[in-house]
Amino acid sequence: MNPESRVIRKVLALQNDEKIFSGERRVLIAFSGGVDSVVLTDVLLKLKNYFSLKEVALAHFNHMLRESAERDEEFCKEFAKERNMKIFVGKEDVRAFAKENRMSLEEAGRFLRYKFLKEILESEGFDCIATAHHLNDLLETSLLFFTRGTGLDGLIGFLPKEEVIRRPLYYVKRSEIEEYAKFKGLRWVEDETNYEVSIPRNRIRHRVIPELKRINENLEDTFLKMVKVLRAEREFLEEEAQKLYKEVKKGNCLDVKKLKEKPLALQRRVIRKFIGEKDYEKVELVRSLLEKGGEVNLGKGKVLKRKERWLCFSPEV
Protein backbone atom coordinates (compact mmCIF):
# COMPACT_ATOMS: atom_id res chain seq x y z
CA MET A 1 0.00 0.00 0.00
CA ASN A 2 1.43 3.39 -0.94
CA PRO A 3 1.73 6.21 1.67
CA GLU A 4 -1.23 8.15 0.30
CA SER A 5 -3.57 5.16 0.41
CA ARG A 6 -2.43 4.29 3.94
CA VAL A 7 -3.31 7.73 5.32
CA ILE A 8 -6.61 7.93 3.41
CA ARG A 9 -7.57 4.49 4.69
CA LYS A 10 -6.95 5.55 8.31
CA VAL A 11 -8.94 8.77 7.90
CA LEU A 12 -11.87 6.80 6.49
CA ALA A 13 -11.57 4.27 9.33
CA LEU A 14 -11.81 7.13 11.82
CA GLN A 15 -14.87 8.49 10.03
CA ASN A 16 -16.47 5.06 10.24
CA ASP A 17 -15.67 4.75 13.97
CA GLU A 18 -16.31 8.30 15.17
CA LYS A 19 -18.43 10.08 12.52
CA ILE A 20 -16.18 13.14 12.79
CA PHE A 21 -18.05 14.74 9.88
CA SER A 22 -21.80 14.27 10.15
CA GLY A 23 -23.59 17.03 8.32
CA GLU A 24 -20.89 19.71 8.47
CA ARG A 25 -20.64 21.52 5.14
CA ARG A 26 -18.02 24.24 5.65
CA VAL A 27 -14.70 23.31 7.27
CA LEU A 28 -12.02 25.72 8.48
CA ILE A 29 -8.52 24.18 8.69
CA ALA A 30 -6.10 25.44 11.35
CA PHE A 31 -3.16 25.88 9.00
CA SER A 32 0.42 26.48 10.16
CA GLY A 33 2.13 25.56 6.90
CA GLY A 34 3.88 22.65 8.60
CA VAL A 35 3.82 19.15 7.16
CA ASP A 36 0.89 18.04 9.35
CA SER A 37 -1.50 20.80 8.26
CA VAL A 38 -0.32 20.58 4.64
CA VAL A 39 -1.16 16.86 4.54
CA LEU A 40 -4.46 17.43 6.35
CA THR A 41 -5.44 19.99 3.72
CA ASP A 42 -4.45 17.68 0.87
CA VAL A 43 -6.48 14.84 2.41
CA LEU A 44 -9.61 16.93 2.98
CA LEU A 45 -9.49 18.33 -0.54
CA LYS A 46 -9.21 14.78 -1.86
CA LEU A 47 -12.13 13.61 0.32
CA LYS A 48 -14.21 16.76 -0.06
CA ASN A 49 -16.94 15.05 -2.07
CA TYR A 50 -16.83 11.90 0.06
CA PHE A 51 -17.54 13.97 3.19
CA SER A 52 -20.10 16.12 1.27
CA LEU A 53 -18.18 19.29 2.11
CA LYS A 54 -19.21 22.50 0.38
CA GLU A 55 -16.09 24.47 1.32
CA VAL A 56 -12.66 23.86 2.83
CA ALA A 57 -10.80 27.04 3.84
CA LEU A 58 -7.59 27.85 5.72
CA ALA A 59 -6.90 29.95 8.82
CA HIS A 60 -3.31 30.87 9.70
CA PHE A 61 -2.31 32.55 12.97
CA ASN A 62 1.03 34.37 13.11
CA HIS A 63 2.38 34.18 16.69
CA MET A 64 5.15 36.71 15.95
CA LEU A 65 7.59 34.59 17.99
CA ARG A 66 10.16 33.65 15.35
CA GLU A 67 12.07 35.46 12.65
CA SER A 68 10.63 32.96 10.18
CA ALA A 69 7.03 33.76 11.17
CA GLU A 70 6.59 36.21 8.28
CA ARG A 71 8.05 33.65 5.86
CA ASP A 72 5.56 31.07 7.14
CA GLU A 73 2.66 33.48 6.68
CA GLU A 74 3.67 34.19 3.09
CA PHE A 75 4.02 30.46 2.39
CA CYS A 76 0.49 29.87 3.70
CA LYS A 77 -0.96 32.62 1.51
CA GLU A 78 0.82 31.24 -1.54
CA PHE A 79 -0.31 27.69 -0.70
CA ALA A 80 -3.93 28.86 -0.58
CA LYS A 81 -3.59 30.84 -3.81
CA GLU A 82 -2.16 27.83 -5.68
CA ARG A 83 -5.20 25.77 -4.68
CA ASN A 84 -7.75 28.55 -5.11
CA MET A 85 -8.63 28.35 -1.42
CA LYS A 86 -9.84 31.09 0.87
CA ILE A 87 -7.40 31.92 3.69
CA PHE A 88 -7.86 33.99 6.85
CA VAL A 89 -4.77 35.35 8.59
CA GLY A 90 -4.50 36.54 12.18
CA LYS A 91 -1.51 38.07 13.93
CA GLU A 92 -0.73 38.91 17.55
CA ASP A 93 2.30 39.43 19.77
CA VAL A 94 2.09 36.24 21.80
CA ARG A 95 5.18 37.05 23.88
CA ALA A 96 3.72 40.36 25.06
CA PHE A 97 0.33 38.75 25.79
CA ALA A 98 2.00 35.96 27.79
CA LYS A 99 3.93 38.49 29.89
CA GLU A 100 0.86 40.65 30.56
CA ASN A 101 -1.25 37.65 31.59
CA ARG A 102 1.47 35.66 33.39
CA MET A 103 1.12 32.71 31.03
CA SER A 104 3.68 30.47 29.37
CA LEU A 105 4.32 31.09 25.68
CA GLU A 106 2.65 27.77 24.86
CA GLU A 107 -0.47 28.62 26.89
CA ALA A 108 -0.70 32.15 25.47
CA GLY A 109 -0.18 30.94 21.90
CA ARG A 110 -2.85 28.28 22.22
CA PHE A 111 -5.32 30.70 23.81
CA LEU A 112 -4.88 33.38 21.13
CA ARG A 113 -4.79 30.86 18.27
CA TYR A 114 -8.08 29.23 19.27
CA LYS A 115 -9.65 32.61 19.99
CA PHE A 116 -8.80 33.66 16.43
CA LEU A 117 -10.05 30.38 14.94
CA LYS A 118 -13.37 30.55 16.78
CA GLU A 119 -13.87 34.18 15.80
CA ILE A 120 -13.46 33.23 12.12
CA LEU A 121 -15.70 30.19 12.59
CA GLU A 122 -18.52 32.35 13.96
CA SER A 123 -18.11 35.46 11.81
CA GLU A 124 -17.76 33.53 8.53
CA GLY A 125 -20.33 30.82 9.24
CA PHE A 126 -18.09 27.74 9.22
CA ASP A 127 -19.40 24.56 10.83
CA CYS A 128 -16.21 23.22 12.39
CA ILE A 129 -12.44 23.63 12.76
CA ALA A 130 -10.19 20.82 11.51
CA THR A 131 -6.80 20.54 13.22
CA ALA A 132 -3.84 18.39 12.17
CA HIS A 133 -3.35 16.64 15.52
CA HIS A 134 -2.23 13.07 14.88
CA LEU A 135 -1.48 9.88 16.82
CA ASN A 136 2.00 10.96 17.92
CA ASP A 137 0.60 14.25 19.21
CA LEU A 138 -1.89 12.21 21.22
CA LEU A 139 0.88 10.02 22.64
CA GLU A 140 2.96 13.07 23.60
CA THR A 141 -0.05 14.70 25.27
CA SER A 142 -0.79 11.58 27.29
CA LEU A 143 2.84 11.27 28.42
CA LEU A 144 2.93 14.95 29.41
CA PHE A 145 -0.14 14.52 31.59
CA PHE A 146 1.35 11.31 33.00
CA THR A 147 4.49 13.14 34.14
CA ARG A 148 2.38 15.79 35.90
CA GLY A 149 0.01 13.33 37.53
CA THR A 150 -3.36 12.56 35.99
CA GLY A 151 -6.38 10.29 35.83
CA LEU A 152 -8.24 8.70 32.94
CA ASP A 153 -8.93 12.02 31.22
CA GLY A 154 -5.24 12.93 30.99
CA LEU A 155 -4.16 9.49 29.80
CA ILE A 156 -6.83 9.57 27.09
CA GLY A 157 -5.68 13.00 25.94
CA PHE A 158 -7.71 14.82 23.30
CA LEU A 159 -10.57 13.27 21.32
CA PRO A 160 -11.10 13.05 17.54
CA LYS A 161 -14.24 15.17 17.91
CA GLU A 162 -14.70 17.81 20.62
CA GLU A 163 -17.34 20.54 20.31
CA VAL A 164 -16.42 22.36 17.06
CA ILE A 165 -12.96 20.74 16.76
CA ARG A 166 -12.37 17.84 14.34
CA ARG A 167 -9.11 15.84 14.17
CA PRO A 168 -9.19 13.71 10.99
CA LEU A 169 -5.56 12.51 11.42
CA TYR A 170 -6.24 11.04 14.90
CA TYR A 171 -5.33 7.49 13.76
CA VAL A 172 -2.32 8.56 11.65
CA LYS A 173 1.33 8.42 12.80
CA ARG A 174 3.75 11.30 12.27
CA SER A 175 5.96 9.05 10.12
CA GLU A 176 2.98 8.24 7.87
CA ILE A 177 2.23 11.94 7.44
CA GLU A 178 5.83 12.65 6.40
CA GLU A 179 5.82 9.69 3.98
CA TYR A 180 2.54 10.95 2.46
CA ALA A 181 3.98 14.44 1.92
CA LYS A 182 7.12 13.11 0.24
CA PHE A 183 5.12 10.67 -1.89
CA LYS A 184 2.86 13.49 -3.13
CA GLY A 185 5.74 15.96 -3.57
CA LEU A 186 4.16 18.47 -1.20
CA ARG A 187 6.01 21.51 0.14
CA TRP A 188 5.84 22.74 3.73
CA VAL A 189 7.69 24.96 6.21
CA GLU A 190 9.64 23.79 9.24
CA ASP A 191 9.17 25.29 12.70
CA GLU A 192 12.69 25.22 14.13
CA THR A 193 11.35 25.42 17.70
CA ASN A 194 10.05 21.85 17.28
CA TYR A 195 13.63 20.71 17.89
CA GLU A 196 14.27 22.70 21.08
CA VAL A 197 14.47 20.04 23.79
CA SER A 198 14.16 22.67 26.52
CA ILE A 199 10.43 22.49 25.74
CA PRO A 200 8.89 19.52 27.66
CA ARG A 201 6.80 18.25 24.73
CA ASN A 202 9.84 18.28 22.45
CA ARG A 203 11.91 16.44 25.05
CA ILE A 204 9.24 13.72 25.13
CA ARG A 205 9.14 13.64 21.31
CA HIS A 206 12.88 13.48 20.66
CA ARG A 207 14.21 11.65 23.72
CA VAL A 208 11.53 9.75 25.62
CA ILE A 209 9.48 8.25 22.77
CA PRO A 210 12.52 6.95 20.81
CA GLU A 211 13.61 5.09 23.96
CA LEU A 212 10.12 3.65 24.45
CA LYS A 213 10.08 2.52 20.82
CA ARG A 214 13.24 0.56 21.48
CA ILE A 215 11.13 -1.47 23.91
CA ASN A 216 8.07 -1.62 21.64
CA GLU A 217 8.52 -0.63 18.00
CA ASN A 218 4.72 -0.61 17.58
CA LEU A 219 4.31 1.88 20.42
CA GLU A 220 1.81 4.18 18.69
CA ASP A 221 -0.50 1.34 17.65
CA THR A 222 -0.35 -0.23 21.12
CA PHE A 223 -1.06 3.14 22.70
CA LEU A 224 -4.09 3.72 20.46
CA LYS A 225 -5.56 0.37 21.53
CA MET A 226 -5.07 1.38 25.18
CA VAL A 227 -6.79 4.72 24.59
CA LYS A 228 -9.80 2.98 23.04
CA VAL A 229 -10.10 0.74 26.12
CA LEU A 230 -9.76 3.71 28.50
CA ARG A 231 -12.34 5.74 26.57
CA ALA A 232 -14.90 2.94 26.84
CA GLU A 233 -14.27 2.58 30.57
CA ARG A 234 -14.47 6.34 31.12
CA GLU A 235 -17.76 6.46 29.24
CA PHE A 236 -19.19 3.79 31.55
CA LEU A 237 -17.95 5.60 34.67
CA GLU A 238 -19.38 8.90 33.44
CA GLU A 239 -22.79 7.34 32.82
CA GLU A 240 -22.82 5.82 36.32
CA ALA A 241 -21.58 9.06 37.89
CA GLN A 242 -24.30 11.06 36.12
CA LYS A 243 -26.99 8.71 37.46
CA LEU A 244 -25.55 8.98 40.97
CA TYR A 245 -25.24 12.76 40.71
CA LYS A 246 -28.95 13.10 39.95
CA GLU A 247 -29.72 10.76 42.85
CA VAL A 248 -27.65 12.51 45.54
CA LYS A 249 -27.92 16.19 44.51
CA LYS A 250 -30.68 18.22 46.12
CA GLY A 251 -30.43 21.89 45.22
CA ASN A 252 -27.01 23.11 46.34
CA CYS A 253 -26.39 20.06 48.54
CA LEU A 254 -25.20 16.46 48.23
CA ASP A 255 -26.64 13.57 50.24
CA VAL A 256 -23.57 12.37 52.18
CA LYS A 257 -25.17 9.13 53.40
CA LYS A 258 -25.99 7.94 49.87
CA LEU A 259 -22.69 9.14 48.38
CA LYS A 260 -20.57 7.39 51.04
CA GLU A 261 -22.10 4.04 50.08
CA LYS A 262 -20.73 4.25 46.54
CA PRO A 263 -17.27 3.31 45.14
CA LEU A 264 -14.47 5.86 45.51
CA ALA A 265 -14.21 6.40 41.74
CA LEU A 266 -17.86 7.48 41.58
CA GLN A 267 -17.56 9.64 44.70
CA ARG A 268 -14.74 11.62 43.08
CA ARG A 269 -16.59 12.08 39.80
CA VAL A 270 -19.75 13.28 41.54
CA ILE A 271 -17.75 15.76 43.64
CA ARG A 272 -15.96 17.05 40.53
CA LYS A 273 -19.31 17.73 38.87
CA PHE A 274 -20.71 19.34 42.01
CA ILE A 275 -17.84 21.77 42.67
CA GLY A 276 -16.92 22.37 39.02
CA GLU A 277 -13.27 21.56 39.70
CA LYS A 278 -10.94 18.78 38.51
CA ASP A 279 -8.04 19.60 40.83
CA TYR A 280 -7.17 16.43 42.79
CA GLU A 281 -6.33 18.24 46.04
CA LYS A 282 -9.61 20.19 46.05
CA VAL A 283 -11.65 17.08 45.29
CA GLU A 284 -9.95 15.20 48.13
CA LEU A 285 -10.51 18.11 50.53
CA VAL A 286 -14.22 18.00 49.76
CA ARG A 287 -14.30 14.21 49.98
CA SER A 288 -12.81 14.40 53.48
CA LEU A 289 -16.06 16.09 54.57
CA LEU A 290 -17.91 12.85 53.84
CA GLU A 291 -16.16 11.34 56.88
CA LYS A 292 -16.26 14.30 59.27
CA GLY A 293 -17.85 17.67 59.87
CA GLY A 294 -16.34 21.03 59.09
CA GLU A 295 -16.00 23.18 56.02
CA VAL A 296 -13.72 23.67 53.03
CA ASN A 297 -12.97 26.94 51.25
CA LEU A 298 -12.30 26.33 47.55
CA GLY A 299 -11.70 29.99 46.75
CA LYS A 300 -13.68 32.23 44.39
CA GLY A 301 -16.46 32.43 46.96
CA LYS A 302 -16.99 28.67 47.07
CA VAL A 303 -17.37 27.39 50.64
CA LEU A 304 -18.67 23.88 51.40
CA LYS A 305 -20.05 22.87 54.80
CA ARG A 306 -21.12 19.51 56.20
CA LYS A 307 -24.54 19.76 57.83
CA GLU A 308 -25.48 16.39 59.31
CA ARG A 309 -26.20 14.17 56.27
CA TRP A 310 -25.84 17.03 53.80
CA LEU A 311 -22.81 18.62 52.14
CA CYS A 312 -23.81 22.11 51.01
CA PHE A 313 -22.46 25.29 49.47
CA SER A 314 -22.53 28.06 52.07
CA PRO A 315 -23.48 30.74 51.38
CA GLU A 316 -25.58 29.35 48.54
CA VAL A 317 -24.10 30.07 45.09
Curated annotation (Swiss-Prot):
Gene3D superfamilies found in the cross-reference section: 1.20.59.20, HUPs (3.40.50.620)
InterPro entries on file: Rossmann-like_a/b/a_fold, TilS-like_C, TilS/TtcA_N, tRNA_Ile_lys_synt, tRNA_Ile_lys_synt_N
Known catalytic reactions: cytidine(34) in tRNA(Ile2) + L-lysine + ATP = lysidine(34) in tRNA(Ile2) + AMP + diphosphate + H(+)
Signal peptide boundaries: none
CDD domains tied to this protein: TilS_N
Entry superkingdom: Bacteria
GO cellular component, one term: cytoplasm
MF annotations from Gene Ontology: ATP binding; tRNA(Ile)-lysidine synthase activity
Record localization: Cytoplasm
Residues where ATP binds: S32, G33, G34, V35, D36, S37
Enzyme Commission number(s) from the entry: 6.3.4.19
Keyword field: ATP-binding, Cytoplasm, Ligase, Nucleotide-binding, tRNA processing
Any Gene Ontology biological process: tRNA modification
Similarity comment text for this entry: Belongs to the tRNA(Ile)-lysidine synthase family.
Entry domain remark: The N-terminal region contains the highly conserved SGGXDS motif, predicted to be a P-loop motif involved in ATP binding.
Function recorded in the entry: Ligates lysine onto the cytidine present at position 34 of the AUA codon-specific tRNA(Ile) that contains the anticodon CAU, in an ATP-dependent manner. Cytidine is converted to lysidine, thus changing the amino acid specificity of the tRNA from methionine to isoleucine.
Protein name (database record): tRNA(Ile)-lysidine synthase
Organism for this UniProt entry: Aquifex aeolicus (strain VF5)
